[in-house]
Regions:
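Alpha-helical substrate-recognition element adjacent to the catalytic core
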Residues: 2-131
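C-terminal cap/substrate-recognition subdomain and adjoining C-terminal extension
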Residues: 86-90, 97-101, 108-252
Length: 252
């Protein structure tokens, strides 16, 4: 785990689900309670398209969940299903080696990332911004700081808090996302002149930015057109280490 006292030159604040990894934030629930899969998929699509709030999504999930997800249940899911897009762990490690603070900023659950860190499935993540609906007792393997994210707009608030804490200038910020749920984060990023990267860009993010005249500075991976469904085979051919040259040019 990276120290909170380390000096960083820059920051990347990135979404996780379908941005760095081919999963939804609720897959661990579907794994343990398969009967909820269809309803969970519908909720995910609704809030990433900005049709319902994240708070409303969390309320609906709490109501349908038979019991809280235990650490053992989360571990069983991770042992069976954890994956990222190719090159993501290496990219995180590369960023940290260049003194770039890598912050995962997601509507996913804090407990999911706590168990990922405990099992050593990713390099030490210094900062995490995630929903606390599933969160476990603190361990030494946890990110040194976990910001609570209750609504989509909290992504921007938590990134802003991180750059103030680490005294990172606006021209050293990259925001990365894939869907309309990242729209408010991109909107804030545009206001502070951050560099905006669409990763596996969905129409909902394209439309959000288009209607607000927000320029996505760089698109990486497979951009999905309005009529296209997810093509996991193509997505898994994208190597995220190829993004390092863009990051180096922008931040270093």
């Amino acid at each position: 785990m990276e120290s909170m006292h380390k000096a960083y030159k820059a920051i990347i604040s990135s979404d996780w689900s379908e941005c760095l990894a081919p999963c939804s934030p609720f897959d661990f629930i579907s794994f343990n309670y398969p009967q909820l899969t269809t309803r969970l998929e519908a909720i995910f699509k609704q809030y990433t398209a900005n049709h319902i709030s994240l708070g409303e999504a969390a309320r609906q999930i709490r109501k349908m969940l038979p019991d809280p997800i235990t650490e053992n249940q989360m571990d069983a899911y991770l042992d069976h299903s954890f994956s990222t897009y190719p090159g993501v762990p290496e990219l995180i490690e590369w960023c940290l080696s260049k003194d770039i603070l890598f912050m995962i900023n997601t509507t996913g659950m804090a407990g999911y990332f706590q168990r990922i860190c405990a099992k050593g499935l990713l390099p030490g993540i210094p900062l995490l911004s995630a929903h606390p609906m599933v969160r476990y007792p603190r361990q030494n393997s946890d990110p040194y700081h976990i910001y609570s994210l209750f609504e989509i707009k909290d992504k921007a608030k938590n990134t802003e808090a991180a750059i103030k804490t680490h005294q990172i200038p606006p021209n050293k910020i990259i925001i990365m996302g894939d869907s309309g749920g990242d729209g408010p984060h991109f909107e804030w990023g545009a206001k502070v002149n951050a560099f905006l990267i669409g990763s596996m860009t969905k129409p909902s993010l394209e439309n959000y930015c288009l209607t607000r005249k927000i320029k996505i500075n760089f698109k990486f991976g497979i951009s999905r057109a309005q009529s296209q469904n997810k093509d996991l085979k193509k997505e898994m051919q994208v190597n995220f280490m190829d993004l390092s040259s863009c990051i180096q040019e922008v931040l270093l």
